Structures are given as C-alpha cells and as structure tokens.
C-alpha cells in the first residue's frame, strides 16, 4: 500500500527480464521486457545495478531507471534474488537490505499455484531453485 500512496517518496523499482510477458502484464509497468540478445547487450554495456539468471531467464535492475527515479526525489525499493543482492551490496555497501521468505517451501508452492500463471513444471523448477 505504501507504494500506492502518491504523497510518499517510496517507489518500487521496475526490473527488466527476458521471460515472456504474462497475461495482464504491461511493459514498463510490471517489467521492462527484453529479448535475450537485448539483455546481454545491456550487460556488456554495464547497464545493470544487478542481474541474475533465474529459472532460465535473465532478471536485472536497470541503472538508468533507478538513477532517474532517485533524481525525481524517490527512495527506490528493489525486489531481487539473493545473488542480485550480493551484487548490490558490493556496489552500494550502505544500502539497506530486508530479506523476505515464505514460511515454507510448501507455502511458496501454494502461492505460485494460486497465481495460475505458470505450468506445473515451471512451478516445481522455482520451488527447487528456492
């Protein structure tokens, strides 16, 4: 709810990914969707604060988006995997990190199934990765 309040300075970062857009998602709102080739070119140009591969897709936080958002006066929150957080920690040692995890792997699987957006195979892959 805090990110929906127009009077707050908090803004949720929009990540970039190579995964396919799900039904109802909007490019530039939910994620910045890129091809694998586009994403890899951005990696070569050092255009990410952090990036990682997860379940066969790239995910990353674009440097320019975060810089622009901060210049607008916002405090930016990133929702990233542990490997990405390690990269951010190296670049920004004073950043505040909060780790959130589901109570159990069964709860994680239940949440993923409840979304209704992924195949059983993809869900199992994500649970195994966790």
From Swiss-Prot:
Keyword vocabulary terms for this entry: ATP-binding, Cytoplasm, Kinase, Nucleotide-binding, Transferase
GO cellular component, one term: cytosol
GO molecular function terms noted in the UniProt entry: ATP binding; guanylate kinase activity
EC number: 2.7.4.8
Catalysed reactions listed for this entry: GMP + ATP = GDP + ADP
The keyword Transferase belongs to this UniProt entry's keyword annotation: yes
Xref: Gene3D superfamilies: Guanylate Kinase phosphate binding domain, P-loop containing nucleotide triphosphate hydrolases
Location in or out of the cell: Cytoplasm
Enzyme kind, highest EC tier: transferase
Annotated effect of mutating residue 109 to R: In strain: MCL8544
Record SUPFAM superfamilies: P-loop containing nucleoside triphosphate hydrolases (SSF52540)
Keyword Glycosyltransferase tagged: no
Ranges for domain Guanylate kinase-like: 1-130
Pfam families: Guanylate_kin
PANTHER family the record matches: GUANYLATE KINASE, GUANYLATE KINASE-RELATED
Functional note: Essential for recycling GMP and indirectly, cGMP.
UniProt similarity note: Belongs to the guanylate kinase family.
Protein name (database record): Guanylate kinase
Organism: Staphylococcus epidermidis
